[in-house]
Amino acid sequence: MIIDLHVQRYGPSGPARVLTIHGVTEHGRIWHRLAHHLPEIPIAAPDLLGHGRSPWAAPWTIDANVSALAALLDNQGDGPVVVVGHSFGGAVAMHLAAARPDQVAALVLLDPAVALDGSRVREVVDAMLASPDYLDPAEARAEKATGAWADVDPPVLDAELDEHLVALPNGRYGWRISLPAMVCYWSELARDIVLPPVGTATTLVRAVRASPAYVSDQLLAALDKRLGADFELLDFDCGHMVPQAKPTEVAAVIRSRLGPR
């Protein structure tokens, strides 16, 4: 079964040249600021399953998202595209490259969350289930501003709340996501590494101030062994929210992988 994703388009009309894949709990419009730095590039920015305005029905797996993204590219692409994945989106991007190498011209992996320690995942999920929502928007904003979004400009954080924070039936506030789906996706992040095919041009951006770190030495060694000269590692001085904290630099990386057309 192929599921249609809600897709935000940026840039001129026409076949997508870039596919962006967001992280767990996020949405396609999170790429809005980055897209402003690539105004002439047609970009497809979907909400993943269980996120935003895409369907919330199960299954909630990497494989289900890969199938939906492949169908999206079959409909909105015209040949291989540069696939940009942040965090969980980086894991999905690697699986997409392995499953449909004909659709992937290059990978840009922004602090990808791949093969995380299972105990760490359990702690994150326990905390998420213990405190799944917020008293008011101010509490939601404070959590992000003192966490992974600490080095993101305040107006960008404000736009995130305007788009993604919603009032819940219980009178509290939460993100526009399916909580059961998030539990499943965090579990998916503990899966073994799935590498892109040999010859896949790949840039991995490591957020050096992400704590705890998402990018492991195991992942870097595996990519380097598989891809050799086709693998590039860049270190950015920022926290985990790389596309929001460093949009100019990320846009330059994407341009370097696009090439002429």
Swiss-Prot record:
Reactions listed under catalytic activity: a carboxylic ester + H2O = an alcohol + a carboxylate + H(+); a tetradecanoate ester + H2O = an aliphatic alcohol + tetradecanoate + H(+); decanoate ester + H2O = decanoate + an aliphatic alcohol + H(+); an octanoate ester + H2O = an aliphatic alcohol + octanoate + H(+)
| InterPro entries listed in its UniProt record | AB_hydrolase_1, AB_hydrolase_fold, AB_hydrolase_sf, Epox_hydrolase-like
| EC supergroup of this enzyme | hydrolase
Q: What is its EC number?
A: 3.1.1.1
How does the activity vary with pH?
A: Optimum pH is 8.0. Retains nearly 60% enzyme activity at pH 6.0. The relative stability of purified enzyme is high at acidic pH and neutral pH (4.0-7.0) as compared to its relative stability at higher pH (9.0-10.0).
Return one Gene Ontology term, BP aspect.
fatty acid catabolic process
Cite the Pfam families for this sequence. Answer: Abhydrolase_6 (PF12697)
Q: How does activity depend on temperature?
A: Optimum temperature is 50 degrees Celsius.
Role, per record: Lipase that displays broad substrate specificity and preferentially hydrolyzes p-nitrophenyl myristate in vitro. Also shows significant activity with pNP-butyrate (68%), pNP-octanoate (82%), pNP-decanoate (90%), and pNP-laurate (74%). Is probably involved in lipid catabolism. Is active at low pH, and might play some important role in mycobacterial biology in macrophages where the bacteria encounters acidic stress.
The family assignment reads:
Belongs to the AB hydrolase superfamily.
Q: What is this protein called?
A: Lipase LipV
Source taxonomy lineage? Bacteria, Bacillati, Actinomycetota, Actinomycetes, Mycobacteriales
